């Protein structure tokens, strides 16, 4: 096993997240060892480098919406460390993201975004969290069961325990299975936006306006979902 001295969490993520994830600091270090071993054995992983923990760079205390994905896009050049998001340079959007944008325009009446970059959502308090934070290129689900689930489960539990306004958007069976981690958090649930399931309950589900209504019921400001 290729091992290295783990960096303190406060050096690799926002301080509130470092405190929230301290109970799984050892697991995060183990996942670092796992990724180094993958590289040592000639395999790569997505997203690259610091983007693995990118979801935890925005302030923990400012998260108002949790949007759960499964694992990163396996297509090289797509995964950026935020669930469903891609870099601004990606012109042909993944099918799930295209469907998210179709529902966004129908739900909110906004024009189609100019790119698939969801960074503005993250900066406004949407935690774009994949349940599994890495993947082998072109092999969807390849890092499931390797240890990331313990990390992201702790992230969800910590958010739910803050006692601050929060809404979870759970698309698909995998995301809905996380409901027991946050029994008191209002949730917007539907089918997954994947092309295989979007017509079975995702389209027409109005997740963005429903999330805002649930935020307002908690006395919080609605989320500004507009994208450039």
Curated annotation (Swiss-Prot):
Xref: Gene3D superfamilies: Uracil-DNA glycosylase-like domain
Chief site of localization: cytoplasm
Keyword ATP-binding: no
SMART domains: UDG, UreE_C
Broad enzyme group: hydrolase
Signal peptide start and end residues: none
Keywords: Cytoplasm, DNA damage, DNA repair, Hydrolase
Stored InterPro entries: UDG_fam1 (IPR002043), Ura-DNA_Glyclase_AS (IPR018085), Uracil-DNA_glycosylase-like (IPR005122), Uracil-DNA_glycosylase-like_sf (IPR036895)
Compartment(s) where it occurs, according to its Swiss-Prot or TrEMBL record: Cytoplasm
GO biological process: base-excision repair, AP site formation via deaminated base removal
Keyword Iron set for record: no
Catalytic activity: Hydrolyzes single-stranded DNA or mismatched double-stranded DNA and polynucleotides, releasing free uracil
Documented EC number(s): 3.2.2.27
Molecular function in Gene Ontology: uracil DNA N-glycosylase activity
Active site: 71 (proton acceptor)
Gene Ontology terms: cellular component: cytoplasm
NCBIfam families reported in the protein's UniProt record: PRK05254.1-1 (NF003588), PRK05254.1-5 (NF003592), ung (TIGR00628)
Function: Excises uracil residues from the DNA which can arise as a result of misincorporation of dUMP residues by DNA polymerase or due to deamination of cytosine.
Family indicated by similarity: Belongs to the uracil-DNA glycosylase (UDG) superfamily. UNG family.
Official protein name in the record: Uracil-DNA glycosylase
Source organism per UniProt: Thermobifida fusca (strain YX)
Organismal lineage: Bacteria, Bacillati, Actinomycetota, Actinomycetes, Streptosporangiales
Encoding gene (name): ung
């Amino acid at each position: 096993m290729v091992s290295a001295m783990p960096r303190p969490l406060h050096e690799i993520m926002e301080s509130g997240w470092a405190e929230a994830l301290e109970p799984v600091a050892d697991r995060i270090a183990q996942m670092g060892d796992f990724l180094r071993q993958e590289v040592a054995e000639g395999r790569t992983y997505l997203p690259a480098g610091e983007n693995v923990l990118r979801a935890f760079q925005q302030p923990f205390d400012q998260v108002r919406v949790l949007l759960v994905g499964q694992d990163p896009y396996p297509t090289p050049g797509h995964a950026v460390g935020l669930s469903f998001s891609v870099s601004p340079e990606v012109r042909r959007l993944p099918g799930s993201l295209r469907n998210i944008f179709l529902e966004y325009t129908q739900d909110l009446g906004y024009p189609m975004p100019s790119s698939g970059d969801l960074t503005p959502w993250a900066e406004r308090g949407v935690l774009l969290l994949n349940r599994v934070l890495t993947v082998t290129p072109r092999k969807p689900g390849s890092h499931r069961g390797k240890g990331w689930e313990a990390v992201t489960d702790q992230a969800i539990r910590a958010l739910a325990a803050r006692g601050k306004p929060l809404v979870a958007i759970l698309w698909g069976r995998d995301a809905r299975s996380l409901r027991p981690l946050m029994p008191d958090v209002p949730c917007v649930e539907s089918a997954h936006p994947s092309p295989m399931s979007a017509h079975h309950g995702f389209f027409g589900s109005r997740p963005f306006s429903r999330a805002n209504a649930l935020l307002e019921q908690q006395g919080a400001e609605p989320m500004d979902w507009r994208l450039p």
